[in-house]
Regions:
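P-loop NTPase motor domains
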Residues: 5-282, 298
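Conserved ATP-driven motor cores of ASCE-family P-loop NTPases powering translocation/secretion/packaging/pilus
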Residues: 274-276, 280-315
Length: 315
């Protein structure tokens, strides 16, 4: 009974949180784990309060279950990738959302290898023909090409030649089992994301992710599905990482970040966002059934930092 009451209290709090923030003219990012529960509230509240925004406000949805009711957005837009480190960060978020056990094994050889390989693929798509094909689906498809063709293409670019030297050394040295293991560590998890709906949504540009742009404020709802969370959380984690970097800047509109059931995805940079974004008018609200879930999925150190940095905790 107690846990049920706690859950009901959380639902009421999150609903009221959304209502109050939109009433006050906040831009908003809402991670809706059981879509469309929170998204409906946000949409209806926005209809009543459009006059609270100085500029016309847009409402956008990412919905992998039914693309007919989804906007399209490319989280690997070339404009987001200024350096190969940005490609690495994207690959890092993707891989750790696909393999949450890796969160506590960061730095291990068989964790870093697939991240580095996928980062190289992303960066190649960024520099090839000015990023014409720089999307997450294109990266998955390129990675699944025969590795002899893949490495020949990637290492034809000088800036990727040194980046991939461990793979090339294994290839030229005849360590084929090691090489195939490294490649499979990237290919196998990503193969779960091969989906026409996901591909279509993640290759378009209906809107930009600067949700708190004073000239183009947005309320963005991204929907997960409890039955497919292991698939969708990976893609949604990439949107999260992009938004975190873009909203935490000075001179932006006040903004709300609401993450329902935060343990269900790896939200890179969440601890830093909580600690530093207040001065940039970013309000963060997290929901979880129990703190032990956060420890399980984020690791004890990162979970403790998040818990200790949060200003208010409601049970």
């Amino acid at each position: 009974v107690r846990s049920r009451r706690q859950r009901q209290m959380w639902i009421r709090d999150s609903n009221n949180y959304i209502r109050q923030q939109i009433e006050k003219g906040f831009a908003a990012y809402i991670y809706d784990f059981k879509y469309p529960d929170l998204s409906i509230i946000a949409y209806n509240q926005l209809l009543k309060n459009k006059d609270k925004y100085a500029k016309p406000v847009g409402f956008y949805v990412i919905n992998f279950d039914d693309p007919r009711y989804s906007h399209r957005c490319n989280p690997l837009n070339p404009s987001f990738l200024s350096d190969i480190a940005d490609a690495y960060e994207s690959a890092y978020v993707i891989m750790l959302n696909l393999n949450k056990s890796w969160i506590q094994k960061q730095g291990d050889f068989f964790v870093e290898s697939p991240i580095v390989l996928f980062a190289a693929v992303i960066w190649y798509l960024k520099i090839y023909e000015n990023g014409k094909f720089c999307t997450f689906p294109h990266a998955i498809e390129l990675l699944n090409k025969p590795y002899s063709d893949l490495f020949t293409i990637l290492t034809s670019y000088r800036e990727l030649e040194n980046y991939l030297s461990p793979f090339m050394d294994a290839w030229k040295g005849g360590a084929m089992e090691q090489l195939q293991g490294q490649i499979a560590s990237a290919k196998i998890p990503l193969s779960r994301l091969i989906s026409p709906a996901l591909y279509w949504i993640m290759t378009g540009d209906d809107f930009t992710l600067d949700i708190n742009n004073p000239e183009e404020p947005k309320v963005l709802c991204v929907g997960n599905n409890p039955d497919r969370q292991n698939i969708y959380s990976c893609a949604l984690g990439l949107y999260n990482a992009r938004i975190v970097k873009m909203v935490n800047r000075k001179g932006r509109l006040k903004c709300s970040i609401l993450v329902d059931e935060v343990p269900t995805l790896y939200f890179k940079g969440l601890d830093t966002l909580i600690a530093t974004a207040r001065s940039n008018k970013v309000a963060v609200c997290l929901g979880a059934q129990d703190f032990s879930q956060l420890i399980r999925d984020y690791g004890d150190k990162e979970a403790r930092v998040i818990q200790n940095t949060i200003g208010t905790v409601s049970y």
